[in-house]
Amino acid sequence: MTSLPNLLSRSDYLLALPMLVLSGFAVAILLLDLVLPKGWKRWNAALALAGLAAATMSLAKVWQAVYYIETPESKRFSGFLGSLVMDRFAIYFYLLFIVGAAVAILMSIRYMEIEHEDHGEYHALILFATIGMMCMASGMDLILLFVGLELMALSTYVLVGFLKRDKRSNEAALKYLLLGAFSSGIFAYGLSLFYGLTGSTNLTEIANKLAQRMADNPRDPIALLALITTATGLLFKIAAVPFHQWAPDAYEGAPTAVTGFMSVAVKAAGWAMLLRIFLFMLWPMREQYTPILIFVAVATMIGGNFAALTQTNVKRLLAYSSISHVGYMLLGLVASDGKNSSTGIKGILVYLAVYTFMNLGAFAVITSLRRRDIIGDELDDLAGLFFKAPSEAVLLLVFLLSLAGIPPLAGFWGKYYIFLSLMETGHYTLAVVAVLFAVLGMYYYLRIANAAFMREAVDAEPVKISPSLGAALWISALGTLGIGLFPEVFLRIVNWSLALSGDARVIGLLR
């Protein structure tokens, strides 16, 4: 029997280097936490940030390998018997995950001390979740994608319930676990059906065999059932209506830094896997899944925007806001016809990046309001923020206006490319509907701004910004303003990343 070392080469280990680095640092944090005295717990956060920095450097090494092997026919570096790939698409998402994890850790340091929950396993779980996300962005095999999804999900279940003394946190974790396990079961059932139909777990082979099968019978009932169950699992992970019920409760009950992490990095991972599966494996079924996506996208915009209008808890409001943004991004997928437009996919990638900065910034402001006996996540807690912390209030306004899509901030460019892609592909009605909902969304963002700038403070407790939280705020602000004011630099990066492993002629992303 062939041994594992003989099956794997040095290039396989190089491909997995960022994940191996993060695994090493996560284990080191768990061991270090056993011997660190209570006053030294911040070293856990420092070690986690060092691990993310080391993973970034190892990613540069992997990118170098991808760069040197690129040809017009091949733009990927594959390993582990073809189940794991590193292409520009994966590198782009790796960077989003690392930025999201790093800013979340910076937000957490003081917050978790106030909550008396500054344990090493918290930072280790963020790193383990990031490893799962990397598998989801790089996977070209159904089994690896599912393992990555579950590693991320199990880590985030624990992170949501990390405030053991908080009933809301415990309740949110239980709901998230039960609904997440149910959706994972449906997703696994869909994947098993595709395996039964094609006899393979490799995305390339499944795509080829599906193309033959759909050419013979476009209404194949087993293939349609596999599509629906797989799509259900994927849409749950990105919190699309009607599979969004977990998001408001999980976002409200989780530690605020974890909420920020889930709203950007976890969501980006779900999108990375969704794009790989829909744009490549399921591309032969695009005529079957496009009507489903249109229905879900419109329902998501309706549900997210209207539910956000009545919320008084800021974290819950931003949860519904996050759901509405998923609707816009799904329209980008609808508009990616693979013939004459890659603008929709460009819009999704831009949207995910700018959303990372502006949403983390908004949650960083909410994190700063947690002090003594004040939770800080209600609209009343924001009252008079401008008079107590004017610079922080101005930054909050920048993040809110960017979320609303106001030019020249970063959020404008995400919506612009989504709407442009709809116009390019003749979806004029969807474009008008999306614009109307974007205008509606301004109302609930202005409600938050109104509380911060126009209302009197309900408490005299000062707002103090720790150095780590200040760093998180300014990283978010620089990303939001930088992409908004200098979009051409960032768009070059996005255009570079529009290379998805597989046959580009099939998925239509390269021209």
Curated annotation (Swiss-Prot):
GO terms for molecular function: NADH dehydrogenase (ubiquinone) activity; NADH:ubiquinone reductase (non-electrogenic) activity; quinone binding. One of its GO terms (cellular component) is plasma membrane. Its main location: membrane. It catalyses: a quinone + NADH + 5 H(+)(in) = a quinol + NAD(+) + 4 H(+)(out). It is found in: Cell inner membrane. InterPro entries: NADH-Q_OxRdtase_suN/2 (IPR010096), ND/Mrp_TM (IPR001750). It comes from the Bacteria. One of its GO terms (biological process) is ATP synthesis coupled electron transport. Belongs to the complex I subunit 2 family. NDH-1 is composed of 14 different subunits. Subunits NuoA, H, J, K, L, M, N constitute the membrane sector of the complex. This is NADH-quinone oxidoreductase subunit N 1. It comes from Koribacter versatilis (strain Ellin345).
